[in-house]
Amino acid sequence: KDSRVRLFENKTNQGYIRNFMSGIVRCDSPYIMLCDQDDIWNWDKVELTLEKMKLMERENPEKPVLVFTDAMNFDSSTGKKLGRFHEMSHLNVKKVDTAHLFMENKCIGCTIMMNRAILPYLRELPEEIRVHDWWLALICSHFGAIGYLPEATLMYRQHEGNQIGGTSYSGYLRKRISKMKEQRQVLFDTYRQGKAFLRVFDSQMTKEQRKTATKFATMADASFFGRRYLALRYGFLKSGLIRNAGLFFLL
């Protein structure tokens, strides 16, 4: 046995979100990285991510900092490289401000590194959290900083259960369009996550942050034209023209 490895077994199935979160809050190291059991890390993944983290910590001392990177998709059955995740998914990783992150997650969880300064913000974990890495990114965008490393630091195993990556972007869009009812529910769940974030962190937000969060949390209650106005006025948008066209159709 390796003394550096500790195994915690949940008494019940908590689901992947709470499974990740319960692991994070148990960490006692200065930095925390997440991984999926079937991904392959590059030999310099930790070194490159830590270098970026140190740079950002100097600019944001004693604040929660999150660094995420790109990943190389590969087919689990053939081993063939399929292309970089963010290029294939057409996600704009430059837009990690709070407004854009309320509407769209940019991070790949298995590429993330965080510092310990994020732990005090994880004392309350509401049921409305959609994805653990999304929640972590929202925290750091509000109270610290987010950095992106364009290098593909791992091989991201593509399998049938993944939403984007191995399939073409056009195939991904066709799938989304064919399930409009489900997409409206996803949008509603995104509003619910924003409302939960406001509820949990209201007292820690600046006046401007609170205003933006409130506008997002109450978008569902606005009129047909009001929802579209709020999206444009406050920047509650997604990546690219096609995604935003779909968003405005659903709003």
Regions found by a protein language model. Give the residues of each.
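C-terminal subregions of glycosyltransferases and related glycan-biosynthesis enzymes
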Residues: 102, 157-251
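Nucleotide-sugar donor-binding/catalytic module of glycosyltransferases
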Residues: 1-169
